Amino acid sequence: MQVIETLADGLKRELKIVIPAADMKARLDERLVDAKDKVRINGFRPGKVPMGHLKKMYGKSIMADLVNELVREKPSEILSSRGEKSATQPAISMTEDEQEAEKILSAESDFEFTVAYEIIPAIELKANDGIKVTREVVEVSEDEINEQILKIAESARTYETKKGKAADGDRVTMNYLGKVDGVAFDGGTAEDAELVLGSGRFIPGFEDQLVGVKAGDEKTITVTFPADYPAANLAGKDATFDVTVKEVAAAAAVEINDELAEKLGLESAEKLKEIVKGQIESQFGNVTRQKVKRQILDQLDEMYKFDTPAGLVDAEFDNIWRQINTDLAQSGKTFADEDTTEEEAREEYRKLAERRVRLGLVLSEIGEKAGVEVTEEEMQRALFQQLQQFPGQQKEILDFFRNTPGASASLRAPIFEEKVIDKLLTEISVTDKTVSKEELLADDGEEETETKKKAPAKKKAAAKADDAAEGEEAAPKKKAPAKKKATEADAE
């Protein structure tokens, strides 16, 4: 077998693989000998079929299998012997000439094929002790704990029927029928709907007009759907709702005591506070980690500059661009609304894709050199978390991860990345800084990359993809589930 390098340009490589016809014939004869004792042909006893007859009947199909095996197996063997790793699946090309293909299948001509690929660049790791990060720490106050407990308590708050007029904080139970231009619309009708006045769950103006109603009242409410309302047929439209009030109920007082804790399944208020404090600390800790991770990645980005495989960048850009267009479609906005053009957006996100690929390669190299491994237990836990996100679709999800090439890598990658970050945190300089909750949660423009400073609106569009790869926080984006009732869709 000959391996001839026909292209070496930057990260691009192209190899011509030549397997002599004599070698192909020897491989074919070996397979025919093996098949001789297995095939059953009328007129011949087992194992007594002449080789010539066997070759005539099965030679080409066996040779076709051999060709497929060689194309499937040889590229990885050759790259390994060259000390190279392909960034993406190598592209294989063979002759398209039918006569030449016939000669190859008959072992009359050398079998040649071409392997084109991009190599993963060699990365010379640098010392990590020059990386310095600030870890923001929030001390959880008693007020913060009590505030969170009150929110929990309010979600389980009880209500008692009242005879008077409804006020802010009261719960109104009602039937309603919504109309636009006098015609009822889908999602605008409900019976026994419960609404706490002042909660902001319904579209603007709806709740305000219920203040002062009593049980048994009938009232027509007039509102205007927001211009950015998710349902295009209702956006900006005036609507009326014929409301029948069935009950007005006042909220029972909420106190943080043992009785409340018992309602929540705990033995005491102290235990409740302990659990809530732990939850808050965990939430703050997650934000802190993301901000620290961002600092680490930004510094690694400055430390390592090298060409990235175009195939990986293209794939990463496609993922980001798909997310952007999905978000724009859901919001009904255009690039002009985001104060940019499609061309500018493509340029900015191409830079982001290159950064993400470069950092991914650096983290991978750091992890491999440090012996970072993802355990089977960690993979199973990640898979279980995926299954929990799609109730009722467990079988489909399992089949996807079992049968889709590369699917398991999507589970492994984030685990591996976090373990590499953990490793780096033991080697770099970390300075703790006590801050307030507001300071921790505030967007820090100075920590944004230059790419994102130029396009703050676009950052939101790809926030989900960006956070997953780089741990960079972005402002949460309000979205309304498509199936939510029309009166509620704009509120949560």
Swiss-Prot record:
GO molecular function: peptidyl-prolyl cis-trans isomerase activity; protein folding chaperone; ribosome binding
Isomerase listed as a keyword: yes
GO CC, one annotated term: cytoplasm
Localization, UniProt: Cytoplasm
Top-level lineage group: Bacteria
Gene3D superfamilies: 3.10.50.40, Trigger factor ribosome-binding domain, Trigger factor, C-terminal domain
Region (Disordered): 77-96, 439-492
Annotated GO biological process: 'de novo' cotranslational protein folding; cell division; chaperone-mediated protein folding; protein transport; protein unfolding
The keyword Lyase is annotated on this UniProt entry: no
Domain PPIase FKBP-type: 169-254
Family classification: Belongs to the FKBP-type PPIase family. Tig subfamily.
Record remark: domains: Consists of 3 domains; the N-terminus binds the ribosome, the middle domain has PPIase activity, while the C-terminus has intrinsic chaperone activity on its own.
Protein name, per record: Trigger factor
Organism ancestry: Bacteria, Pseudomonadati, Pseudomonadota, Alphaproteobacteria, Hyphomicrobiales
The gene coding this protein: tig
